[in-house]
């Protein structure tokens, strides 16, 4: 009689990678819809550009490596990378920026390390950081949400601006960014940081139109709540685990609350941190990447808490208004160390 010896793992999750990626893509629909509503059709154009670029870049590398193109593209990981990058950049950023960022993310940050499962850093965030450092002006040129905007460009105008820099009527990006108070608007986090450095009081800052929302910044609060809804659905579907999002949000809220209580004249209130920028997108869709996050439950709690602390520190004291991308990459660096010290004890073995 011949006994077959199989290597671990001996228990398996029946869900394939492609299905999990598809669930994440579906969960992103509420967040995408909210961004389309508040910032216009540019987001959809960026998603289409990023998706096509990601698939072509991945196919090219797979062809060069003589690997199966069709089988790998079916895992949907390239599409997810493109999507996450596209929703992270301003909706009217030039077309070549999203193409450049996506190609860099797929080829350099993912395939250069061996493909899905081998990359130590989140590819979408690598692409985002490369663009942010290289083109800071374009990467911070967000439109004001439609609640306070003079006008939001339609689909044709969005395409025109993305590909040529001008609308059909001759308006440019600066014209579109002109807010109701006659000044160029930015995100709530960017506005807060810039205004504090200019010597304005928090009381004055919170009177700006960008903070006319019920809980936080106009438009941005609903965008974050939409991403939160998608994240809760992912938890319900058991596509992600709760450890990273919970520890991230609790740590960010705790740090923001303590900072605000000790320095209310210079630091943003907790609701600004939780419902502005890429907070919920990062908590449920970026930090939960199974490849670049910690693999143990205790490790996931530490990983999420570290990212939350880093986001608050970068937003409060760093040079960039939103620190999610940098926090994710810095936390990715610590994953091997976290996993080493949180690995479970082998059954039957005692600690030495």
Curated annotation (Swiss-Prot):
Keyword Magnesium: no
Intracellular or extracellular location(s): Cell inner membrane
Cofactors demanded by this protein: FMN
Domain of life, source organism: Bacteria
EC number: 7.-.-.-
GO biological process: one example: transmembrane transport
Main subcellular location: membrane
Record's keyword terms, sorted: Cell inner membrane, Cell membrane, Electron transport, Flavoprotein, FMN, Membrane, Phosphoprotein, Translocase, Transmembrane, Transmembrane helix, Transport
Stored InterPro entries: NqrB/RnfD, RnfD_bac
Residues annotated as transmembrane: 20-40, 42-62, 89-109, 123-143, 214-234, 242-262, 267-287, 301-321, 322-342
Role summary: Part of a membrane-bound complex that couples electron transfer with translocation of ions across the membrane. Required to maintain the reduced state of SoxR.
NCBIfam families documented for this protein: PRK00816.1 (NF002011), rnfD (TIGR01946)
Similarity section: Belongs to the NqrB/RnfD family.
Quaternary organization: The complex is composed of six subunits: RsxA, RsxB, RsxC, RsxD, RsxE and RsxG.
PANTHER family reported for this sequence: ELECTRON TRANSPORT COMPLEX PROTEIN RNFD, ION-TRANSLOCATING OXIDOREDUCTASE COMPLEX SUBUNIT D
Name of the molecule in the record: Ion-translocating oxidoreductase complex subunit D
Gene encoding the protein: rsxD
